[in-house]
Regions:
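Acidic-residue sensor for enzyme active/binding pockets
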Residues: 148
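Portal/gating segments that form or line small-molecule/metal binding sites
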Residues: 1-145, 155-205
Length: 205
């Protein structure tokens, strides 16, 4: 049985839109793309690589897939371990209609997302890892399919842009299983989804 894990770059105010470049995702007139780049470091790159190398297969939304497919197949240096990992991995692509998938080892999950992902989780071992893919992740979270979240939080408030969790996301508590403080104020946190949140009161009897 696989676990479904999610990895995201995220701002202090929860924005995940266009972390890697100004033209990555301009939906809604978003003009702050590339906000991760000034804070990136060798230590962060190593931590991201360790996380992605845990994946047995990848699950990507169509937009993230297209961004990756425009770049990684062009990186052919065998010494680039991230390119080797991403190019060699099976990539399951979520899209409402069947897309043309030219990147090697890419497969459409089909029209029934929930059934397809449940089947993928049941058929193997290790991690089925969703990278970025905010719209897809929101759907998976609403379906109760996400087992873990790995978040790299950057010390920036963007004030606008698409946020990781929808306003109607189901309430969930999280168990912290891994934590590290990295260079330039970036934090690494890995959470396990732990069920419904509990509540209490500070009121005195």
């Amino acid at each position: 049985m696989r676990t479904l894990t999610v990895t995201q770059f995220i701002s202090l105010d929860g924005v995940v839109q266009a972390p890697g470049g100004p033209d990555e995702d301009t939906r809604g007139g978003f003009e702050l793309g590339g906000w991760v780049v000034p804070h990136f470091s060798e230590a962060l790159g190593a931590r991201v690589g360790e996380t992605h190398f845990r994946a047995s297969e990848l699950l990507l939304g169509r937009r993230t897939y297209d961004i990756f497919a425009a770049h990684w197949p062009r990186v052919t240096d065998p010494a680039d371990t991230m390119a080797t990992k991403l190019n060699g991995s099976v990539k399951h692509v979520a899209s409402h209609t069947e897309p043309a998938l030219a990147w090697a080892h890419s497969r459409w999950v089909g029209a029934d997302l929930e059934s397809a992902v449940r089947a993928l989780l049941a058929e193997g071992e290790g991690e089925l890892q969703a990278i970025g893919s905010r719209d897809l992740v929101q759907s998976l979270f609403a379906l109760g399919l996400v087992d873990e979240l790995t978040l790299w939080t950057f010390p920036v408030v963007l004030g606008k842009g698409n946020r990781l969790f929808a306003a109607d996301a189901p309430p969930r508590s999280m168990e912290l299983v891994e934590s590290a403080d990295l260079d330039h104020g970036v934090t690494h946190r890995r959470y396990r989804v732990a069920g419904a949140p509990t509540a209490g009161s500070f009121a005195l009897d």
